[in-house]
Amino acid sequence: MGLAAAKSTKKNIAIFSLEMPAEQLIMRMISSLGQIDNKKLSTGKLENDDWKRFNEAISILADTNIFFHDAGGVTPSEIKAKCRRLATQGEGLGLVIIDYLQLIDSSSRYSGSRQQEVSEISRALKTMALELEVPVIALSQLSRSVEKREDKKPVLSDLRESGSIEQDADIVAALHAPDVEVPVGDEVPNPIQLIILKHRNGPTKTIDLLFKKKTSTFLSIRKENGASAN
């Protein structure tokens, strides 16, 4: 998502990758851009055609304004300070992505109540989005209770330690892998649903996609049974 945004604008894109090292995230971006098997990338065993697409992907990535932050222990105020600086540089700030919300440190104000801590973080991100006039995409964990249900399709109440997340967010979307039989192997894209659970200014709906695991690519499904990369 951050990569797609970066390719379409000259504005700065801030990615706070609090779970995955930036190096690993960049490798996934190269895999997606060049449509190169991520297993080949991780081992360095690329074929001639792979190297060509690798260089093209590097060139595209180098032309974007993506800024990574992968250090742990970051607080909402630190995120805001970094984003404020990016907003004053170049063409300004176009998008903020945080992976994931529950890994952000809160103040000691609500020490002992994780739900209140997450609520404080959620409100701080909402305030930042309004002040800087920038969209903020914050990934969130789901509660383990979803695995105990027969119907595992996510609902709003499944947001882990949700607090005020569902109230603060303009849009809440969840990814869901339908329980269908699919051929085994990385070559076959897996069906996946993007479920819009909340849309403050629009309808909720479910969008059918395909996920190509070996290149970490989502594909939109065309009515004529084709597929195009997103």
Language-model segments: residues:
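Cytosolic-facing regulatory segments adjacent to core modules
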Residues: 4-92, 106, 206-208
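Walker B catalytic acidic pair
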Residues: 100
